[in-house]
């Protein structure tokens, strides 16, 4: 009898691990813990120029989230604000993963807001989008009297965060955010910064095979819910490469060349160029260096530092300070 119970428990556990999105979500969350950032040679000098305000709350009282503020120490006037949504495959990651990079951006004369948001599978689509809108409402109300130029917003994201902010941009352009009016207008967003994001999710769901198919389906179930409950158009709706991007603001797009979404990023650059949206695409051939997913945070690499320099030039071209 006991042997049967043990066997049933083992079988049940294996089936749960195979069919439920929770086990793989937990594993991936652990993989993303701590981020991948490495130090730049001039880190100490850069960090000495900026200040941080950590763990400011936003959102509704029953589901509060938190954001960090990084800005120059010496500031006497309002400045453009970069709002950054972190990556983590929708199930992991943290605002602190962006802190070092945010300090470099702040040293250029920008305020950087790095937000946390509710993670899958506990919270599912479109919760992060609503939380981004909640954060922008919070910043617009400016309870903390931050020196934000709210007419010069830059939306930024890495990995899953890049997909989230690019999707949110579409709703701002249409002025229809799930039947509501977005917190901001398209005129207030001066540019998008997109790092290592997936911009065409539908093919991953419909054409992937083998172990990768199993992994993708578990992650999609974690974020969107079980496939049987997902409207057939959702994967198209969240895939930027299947949408009209002609009214997008200027975009900065980069990706690594090893086990990331470089091909999709290059296609997005081409799409934006075709519709005359100003775009800067930064990519490196594998003959130069093998650059993994989220390489931009690895500032011990010369390519990451080169990308940061190009990003600074892009921001200078598209903001007023």
Predicted regions and their residues:
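Alpha/beta-hydrolase superfamily serine-hydrolase fold, recognizing
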Residues: 2-321
């Amino acid at each position: 009898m006991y042997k049967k119970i043990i066997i049933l428990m083992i079988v049940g556990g294996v089936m749960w691990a195979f069919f439920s999105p929770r086990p793989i979500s937990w594993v991936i969350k652990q993989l993303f813990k701590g981020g991948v950032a490495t130090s730049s040679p001039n880190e100490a000098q850069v960090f000495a120029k900026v200040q941080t305000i950590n763990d400011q709350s936003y959102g509704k009282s029953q589901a509060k989230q938190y954001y960090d503020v990084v800005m120059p120490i010496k500031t006497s006037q309002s400045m453009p604000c970069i709002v950054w949504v972190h990556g983590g495959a929708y199930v992991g990651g943290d605002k602190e993963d962006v802190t070092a990079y945010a300090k470099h951006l702040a040293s250029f004369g920008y305020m950087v807001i790095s937000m946390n948001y509710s993670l899958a599978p506990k919270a599912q689509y479109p919760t992060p989008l609503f939380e981004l809108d909640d954060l922008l409402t919070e910043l617009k109300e400016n309870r903390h009297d931050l020196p934000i130029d709210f007419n010069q917003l830059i939306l930024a994201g890495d990995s899953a965060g890049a997909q989230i902010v690019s999707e949110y941009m579409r709703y701002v352009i249409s002025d229809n955010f799930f039947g509501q009016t977005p917190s901001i207008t398209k005129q207030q967003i001066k540019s998008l910064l997109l790092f290592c994001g997936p911009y065409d999710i539908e093919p991953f769901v419909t054409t992937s095979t083998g172990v990768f198919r199993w992994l993708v389906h578990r992650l999609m179930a974690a974020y969107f819910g079980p496939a049987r409950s997902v409207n057939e158009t959702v994967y198209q709706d969240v895939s930027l490469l299947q949408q009209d991007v002609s009214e997008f603001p200027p975009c900065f797009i980069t990706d690594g060349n090893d086990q990331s979404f470089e091909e999709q990023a290059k296609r997005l650059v081409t799409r934006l160029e075709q519709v005359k949206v100003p775009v800067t695409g930064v990519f490196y051939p594998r003959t130069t260096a093998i650059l993994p997913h989220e390489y931009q945070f690895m500032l011990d690499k010369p390519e990451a530092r080169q990308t940061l320099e190009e990003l600074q030039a892009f921001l200078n071209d598209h903001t007023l300070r």
